[in-house]
Curated annotation (Swiss-Prot):
Molecular function via GO: argininosuccinate synthase activity; ATP binding
Domain of life assignment: Bacteria
InterPro entries per record: Arginosuc_syn_C, Arginosuc_syn_N, Arginosuc_synth, Arginosuc_synth_CS, Arginosuc_synth_type_1_subfam, AS_cat/multimer_dom_body, Rossmann-like_a/b/a_fold
Catalytic activity: L-citrulline + L-aspartate + ATP = 2-(N(omega)-L-arginino)succinate + AMP + diphosphate + H(+)
Lineage: Bacteria, Bacillati, Bacillota, Bacillota incertae sedis, Caldicellulosiruptorales
Family: Belongs to the argininosuccinate synthase family. Type 1 subfamily.
A matching Pfam family: Arginosuc_syn_C
BP terms from Gene Ontology: argininosuccinate metabolic process; L-arginine biosynthetic process; urea cycle
Subunit composition and interactions: Homotetramer.
Binding site for L-citrulline: 87, 92, 123, 127, 176, 185, 262, 274
Enzyme Commission number(s) from the entry: 6.3.4.5
Main location: cytoplasm
Official protein name in the record: Argininosuccinate synthase
Amino acid sequence: MKLNKVVLAYSGGLDTSVIIPWLKENFDCEVIAVVVDVGQEDDFDAIKEKAYKTGASKVYIEDAKEEFVNEYIFPTLKAGAIYEGKYLLGTSMARPLIAKKLVNIAKKENADAIAHGATGKGNDQVRFEVTIKALMPQIKIIAPWRIWNLKSREDELNYLTQKGIDIPFKKEESYSMDGNIWHLSHEGLDLEDPWNMPDFDKVLKITKNPLKLADLPETVEIEFEKGIPVKVNGQQMGGVELLKTLNKIGSNHGIGIADIVENRLVGMKSRGVYETPGGTILYYAHRELEYLCLDRATLHFKDMVAIRFAELVYDGLWFSPLREALSAFVDKTQEVVNGTVRLVLYRGNIYSAGSKSPNSLYIKDLATFEEDQMYNQKDAEGFINLFGLPLKVFGMVNRKEDE
């Protein structure tokens, strides 16, 4: 089958470098490589050069850091979305954005297909493809890992040699990693056995080993406006700068290390270690402010929304009507989430050290045991009688006197 142009999600790794000549051989097509910068801090000049050497006709380097932070990370933060109680969705949030950029370039280049290097066992194939289907339903999607005969890293290296492509790739001796401005994940090797404790000295790349820290605690203040962090220690910052600042602060104190066995969308469990220093601080601070500013009913209902929101993000359904509708609800709740939270960081732990807000629902005169004008304690009796009436009736009808 001949195609004119194929847009490829390119990372510069072995898999996507092999895909370029493979696409040209099997589809007799021009391959346009697209690298999306979501804060992974790669050598993009070297990646661009590698793409051309393996046969790409054109290479796009798309800087999407600001969009990633402001339009994907912060909405998820406001929702309080955490997958299965531990995973802060770093990879999950990035994939729909990358797919969106692929679609934009495919339209610009009038491409016939979009290709990606995700394997047939992981979540990313789903995240890429459902996003592409949502944004460009008519385009063909090519997933080489599901159709080619290359079964191993050695097969891939031999394929490049056969094609006369001489690019050195290091022997795979490290963990499989995925990084962006929000997090860095580690999978494979000894982590595949959930009984093995991670060797933090070997695994961690951005966060200091909390078991070996002897540093003094550090206090940090974060200010929010409508649920969005805008200041760190009194200094106004844009989203990218703010997250980088908190990543540095948090990593110095071993904050944000999560060892997770998660349920993949495709039916299996996987184990990974995640470093999310700045994100962990933001989630903690944001929640503390919500405790102060949200009423009981809204806070409790929002907790239920957060679970479903996290599932949608994890499953790659960022552009689904439900995710967008839930975000509209979240945005309404965040109108009153304004104020400052003070935290203390020490040896991998976060401690609350104060919070204040112009929208605080905490009123000292109501909470105190002293007499006040707003709350008449005698009113409680009638409330309890009515609140407990269903249980009283049930007991009268169904419980025996000697129970």
